[in-house]
Regions:
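N-terminal intrinsically disordered, cationic/polar leader segments
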Residues: 1-110, 118, 122, 126-137
């Protein structure tokens, strides 16, 4: 089944990015990242080709940067959240059951993680935030 699935669209929406630069006396920090709930919708027809149906994956991932001051206080240095939408096509010859989707959920989650990482890096790149390596992908 997976060999016949094609990614045709990746989009982001509702980007929220807040950056509070590190203050002097602040040590290096860390970050927390989460993908959030992933929703899967399947079965709609592709408008440009009726022989194909689509799988639409949506998620609302976020990553939060944290730093610790010399007195032990923890501060949020950045917060990035956005909506992520991936659209895949598959031929109508595949009987896409809920069980088949569940068996292959890992594939869709992996793609969400890859594009989450890519989008985060692109948004953070022009800022003063450096040397963050998201573990996804």
């Amino acid at each position: 089944m997976l060999s016949e699935i094609r990614l045709i669209e990746v989009s982001t929406s509702n980007i929220h990015f807040k950056h509070t630069p590190l203050k002097s006396g602040t040590n290096r920090g860390n970050f927390e990242a989460e993908i959030g709930e992933i929703t899967v919708e399947a079965g709609k027809k592709l408008k440009s080709d009726e022989a194909l149906s689509i799988i639409e994956i949506t998620a609302s991932p976020k990553v939060v940067g944290l730093s610790t001051t010399s007195d032990g206080a923890i501060h949020e240095t950045f917060n990035l959240q956005f909506g992520l939408r991936l659209v895949f096509t598959y031929p109508d010859s595949i009987d896409l059951t809920p069980e088949l989707l569940d068996e292959n959920r890992w594939f869709f989650e992996y793609n969400v993680k890859i594009f989450f990482k890519t989008q985060c890096e692109q948004i953070i790149k022009p800022t003063t935030i450096k040397n963050i390596e998201l573990p996804f992908g």
